[in-house]
Amino acid sequence: KAVKQAKKSIHMEYFNFRNDSISALLFDLLAEKAAEGVEVRALYDGFGNCSNDRPLKQHHLDSLHRRGIQIKEFDRLAFPFFQNSFFRDHRKVVVIDGLIAYTGGMNVADYYVVGKPEFGAWRDLHCRIEGDAVAELQ
């Protein structure tokens, strides 16, 4: 709801955006907002992306860029992997118009909504933050 109501900016930082139906819905919404003139920026972790079974590939990123979404990879994995494998960005933060923020443990993936059979039932949370604390997450 808050993303749909954004007027100026949507900034997202996630460990990964899994290439599935949830991220497709989100990216469609973000593209709509970008077309309305909202600044849409997203950051994801290089290891987080390549460690999931449905990573974003270059053609996905190219499509997102064409649709007005500024998406960047943090610390791309490169050989030798051990040089940067522990310097990861595991944050999950969304800031909308500098007024509302969400943070918690959820990445962008179907299984945060429907679960994952091999892990059984679990719950991950995100919290909505308003007021001065939003500036700390911006």
Where are these regions (language model features)?
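HKD-type phospholipase D/PLD-like phosphodiesterase module
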Residues: 1-9, 13-138
